[in-house]
Amino acid sequence: MREPIISVRELSKRFGDFTAVDRISFDVARGEIFGFLGANGAGKTTAMRMLCGLSYPTSGSGTVAGYDVMREGERIKRRIGYMSQRFSLYDDLTVLENIRLYAGIYGLRRREMLRRTVTLLDRLQFRREAGTLVGSLPLGWKQKLAFSVATLHRPEVVFLDEPTGGVDPVTRRQFWELIYEAAAGGTTVFVTTHYMDEAEYCSRVSIMVDGQVRALGAPAELKRQFAAGSMDEVFRTLARGAKRTE
């Protein structure tokens, strides 16, 4: 494996008597598209929040971009991009205002901010929509804008939490083209999803069940391992014994 940009060992998160994430371990290589899969309630979002510096682990160890998830959450936040299920955009601001807001948060200098803003608007073909309120945009457009804003500062890693929920298959495929573009530029992509067909787009995937990583490998490897014709079959095999329900 190439040099890992994310490394996790026995990482756990407990809330009282409930163990949301249970001793997970894995590495993610630089430039990899890593799928973090599992049903709702499996612990994916909780694990991602720890890796993003938004929540501290109960036990275990891990690093993201060289920083300790137990002690250096604030430093991690400055080195990553993050896109939540709700796209992290402000509906009452225009497209351009959202871009400028996040450029400022990321600390981009004015000249660089202007250059990257123009590039972003051109790539998305959003020049005519620059003055449009984000709240009035179609869902698929919001999705593309949110991803582009999350990677505006060219982070080493971008974390995507269920980014394609609620959109049609064609729009999902278009969104994945943006992911491929970011990965080709050297950004590591860590994406959670419960759409098993999207696992086929990843370099490697892990599958969480009841807070634990039950499978890890390239999609083709996992399908061979479980004698399955699709990642959906792999997931169903693993999920049969799940104790958690939504």
Language model region names:
Residues 60-71, 75-76:
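Conserved ABC transporter NBD signature motif
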Residues 100, 104, 111-129:
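Conserved ABC ATPase "signature" region
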Residues 154:
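Conserved catalytic motifs of ABC-family nucleotide-binding domains
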Residues 158-162:
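Catalytic Walker B motif of ABC-type/P-loop ATPase nucleotide-binding domains
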Residues 216-217:
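ABC ATPase "signature
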